[in-house]
């Protein structure tokens, strides 16, 4: 079977390593600051290096390492992922850009025009990561006071309108959140491939909306049994509408030659964790974040307290923010856990590691080639001594084949 594997591009910048204090000092979107590696002051002057240069380097590295594309996250502190996708498309060849955005802050007709323009310009390399918002201060930053469940209703209506205008035929809509009369894409843009939709959310409202709209239901990593139950719920909702969604998981990875070396990396990063923050619940009304807190011990005495099953660690968010769960282990162990997730029903992965540039090469070269090896029931056939067709270069390997 074929598994789509994406990498994460750090829109806010990057840590030089997981062992550095919790600050962005490489490719920081906020510009130069003391201790920055890039941009930096050299010879008393700024070196001219920007966060976009760093993002382009990560995109090129992960494309050459065999990843299908990259996730462009969206936060109040970052530049707009739509604009960054357009810029980075010129730096890559086949690389897809998964643009994260909240439908509440963009009219669906304008989103359709932007999307079709990107599809036309890039040869169909746009992918949607639809996020409806987790509440709390980040949501208020946008001035958005729509309730949790209503945000998912708004997202569903947004996607209905976006699809309605996509084929170029006049489309009317009078809904609760959006209104349009006779809207349609112009002939030059109509008919482009509609972007694949990655849809996330753990609440009943999110699962229901995902069942109606998701090509891929996207979840953070959780204990595997809990992921299976979540996928079953999405699948049941989708079947009621005659749809069959696929499933994707976003995972941070620390993979090294040995398991001991991987945990040593975690131990060094753990030295910078705010222990008080480690015992505080997350703000906001995100059901997914609340689920994560349910797996975290009330009192944490050491980093190994957060290993919830072999090689599955829920302390990543304490070291550098973002999702809590990730995989820690040797290259073989991490590949085996990914294989187990494929057995569970996962069709796509969004992987990440700090620093994103070097780890793209490491994971692409050391982990991805191992996927499926533990699933073989017989030895793989030896390649011919004089193959008629040369092996495909990483640039052309956009899907990972799992045997």
Residues covered by each model-derived region:
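Short, conserved secondary-structure transition motifs
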Residues: 249-261, 386-403
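Flexible, glycine-rich active-site loops centered on histidine and acidic residues
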Residues: 2-48, 105-173, 221-235, 244-246, ...
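Acidic-and-aromatic substrate-binding clefts and catalytic sites of carbohydrate-active enzymes
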Residues: 72-81, 104-109, 223-229, 255, ...
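Short, acidic/polar
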Residues: 48-61, 81, 199-209, 266-268, ...
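Hydrophobic faces of well-ordered beta-strands that scaffold small-molecule active sites
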Residues: 3-9, 69-72, 95-101, 126-130, ...
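Alpha-helix-loop-beta-strand connector modules within alpha/beta enzyme cores
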Residues: 81-99, 154, 158, 239-241, ...
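N-terminal beta1-alpha1-beta2 module of alpha/beta enzyme domains
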Residues: 1-92, 192-195
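Conserved, mostly hydrophobic/aromatic
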Residues: 62, 66, 88, 118, ...
């Amino acid at each position: 079977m074929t598994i789509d594997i994406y990498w994460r591009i750090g829109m806010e910048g990057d840590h030089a390593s997981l062992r550095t204090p919790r600050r962005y000092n490489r490719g920081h979107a906020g510009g130069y600051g003391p201790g920055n590696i890039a941009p930096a002051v050299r010879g008393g002057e700024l070196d001219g290096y920007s966060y976009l240069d760093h993002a382009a380097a990560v995109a090129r590295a992960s494309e050459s390492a065999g990843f299908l594309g990259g996730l462009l996250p969206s936060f109040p502190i970052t530049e707009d992922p739509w604009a960054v996708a357009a810029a980075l498309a010129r730096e890559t060849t086949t690389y897809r850009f998964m643009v994260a955005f909240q439908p509440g802050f963009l009219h669906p007709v304008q989103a359709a025009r932007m999307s079709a323009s990107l599809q036309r310009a890039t040869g169909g390399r746009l992918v949607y990561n639809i996020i409806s918002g987790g509440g709390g201060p980040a949501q208020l930053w946008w001035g958005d006071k729509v309730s949790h469940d209503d945000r998912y209703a708004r997202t569903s209506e947004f996607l209905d309108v976006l699809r309605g205008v996509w084929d170029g035929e006049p489309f009317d809509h009078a809904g609760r959140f959006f209104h349009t009369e006779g809207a349609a894409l112009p002939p030059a843009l109509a008919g482009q491939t509609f972007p694949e939709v990655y849809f996330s959310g753990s609440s009943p409202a999110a699962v229901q909306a995902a069942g109606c709209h998701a090509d891929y239901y996207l979840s953070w990593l959780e204990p595997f049994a809990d992921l299976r139950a979540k996928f079953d719920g999405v699948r049941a909702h989708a079947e009621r509408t005659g749809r069959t969604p696929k499933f994707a998981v976003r995972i941070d990875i620390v993979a090294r030659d040995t398991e001991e070396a991987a945990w040593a990396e975690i131990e060094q990063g753990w030295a910078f964790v705010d222990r008080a923050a480690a015992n505080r619940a997350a703000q906001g009304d995100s059901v997914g974040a609340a689920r994560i807190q349910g797996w975290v011990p009330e009192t944490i005495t050491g980093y190994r307290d957060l290993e919830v099953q072999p090689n599955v660690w829920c302390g990543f968010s304490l070291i550098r923010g973002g999702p809590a769960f990730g995989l820690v282990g040797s290259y073989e162990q991490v590949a085996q856990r990914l294989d187990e997730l494929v057995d569970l029903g996962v069709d796509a992965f969004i992987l990440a590691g700090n620093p994103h540039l070097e780890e793209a090469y490491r994971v692409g070269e050391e982990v991805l080639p191992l996927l499926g090896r533990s699933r073989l029931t017989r030895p793989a056939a030896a390649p011919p001594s004089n193959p008629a067709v040369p092996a495909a270069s990483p640039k052309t390997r956009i899907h990972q084949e799992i045997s």
